[in-house]
């Protein structure tokens, strides 16, 4: 793929209005994408991160190698230590993002060289946009969704099978999370929205959803266990949910979970992980797939067909227009006021020995 123009030919953004969103939510594409996410979640029910499915397919191994390469690309673009101090995103992220975009199609073909050029171009759109926004230096659930759509496309094109679903979460998505934690902490990626649209975490939703399914059959761990630091430390590498709590605790040190993550605190009062897992799917449907500030940036393609009757694609000039054309549910949701990352605030606190607010 030679440039961004080819990316736009392979996939298009089409959800621009509330009417478009209603058509999307009633569409077969919406239903099938949500079913895919639910199937991934069900495939890890009762499994720890290390409980992979055997045998491991060549496609899963190729995806793991791709993610290793992503870490290598990040290593090639270090943050300049003498750069001006800022609590906002590091500009070196743009160099990382530019290289990923330039190599996206080739990286897709490394996963399966038998993909057609058209298929590789489509998949490269989702892979290239799964790491954050290079202009705003931010990351949120829409970028996370792009990675899931990349996996969905590989499944629709026969590269992945349903047998791979467990490992797609426990080997591939877990490794994707590892890469994202590197990018979030290295480049101080800003959260795409003031508190995240859903209020769980500044960046992610799906590790909470998958993690709740992992814990659904656990006899001893309860949702309220997230308030016990020793339990969190013991299980952070075994379950995605506890891994997210551990990350939050490390970067948001100036107050309790109850203060900076009130929705997680509320969820901890639910009686069982089964109820949490059921609620997470409903929440993802409503607060991610059903919210225009996120879905107006969603790409449609041959394997994610556009619903009938939605708006035509915008021109390049319209894409670059003022963000007042976008829908926002809170200030800073999309491409407006930048929000400093909690990682940046935590680092500033460590260096200056006095607390700085992160929101």
Swiss-Prot record:
Record-level GO cellular component terms: cytoplasm; nucleus; protein phosphatase type 2A complex
The cross-references to Pfam families, in alphabetical order and at most eight, read: PTPA (PF03095)
Q: Tell me where in or outside the cell this protein is found.
A: Cytoplasm
Task: Give EC number(s), comma-separated.
Answer: 5.2.1.8
Q: Name one GO biological process term.
A: mitotic spindle organization
Q: What is its main location?
A: cytoplasm
Name any one GO molecular function: peptidyl-prolyl cis-trans isomerase activity
InterPro entries under this entry? Phstyr_phstse_ac, PTPA_C_lid, PTPA_sf
EC class, as a word, reads isomerase
**Superkingdom of origin organism:** Eukaryota
Which reaction equation describes what this protein catalyses?
A: [protein]-peptidylproline (omega=180) = [protein]-peptidylproline (omega=0)
Record keywords, A-Z: Cytoplasm, Isomerase, Rotamase
Family classification: Belongs to the PTPA-type PPIase family.
State its role: PPIases accelerate the folding of proteins. It catalyzes the cis-trans isomerization of proline imidic peptide bonds in oligopeptides. Acts as a regulatory subunit for PP2A-like phosphatases modulating their activity or substrate specificity, probably by inducing a conformational change in the catalytic subunit, a direct target of the PPIase. Can reactivate inactive phosphatase PP2A-phosphatase methylesterase complexes (PP2Ai) in presence of ATP and Mg(2+) by dissociating the inactive form from the complex.
Q: Write down what this protein is called.
A: Serine/threonine-protein phosphatase 2A activator 2
Organism this protein belongs to = Eremothecium gossypii (strain ATCC 10895 / CBS 109.51 / FGSC 9923 / NRRL Y-1056)
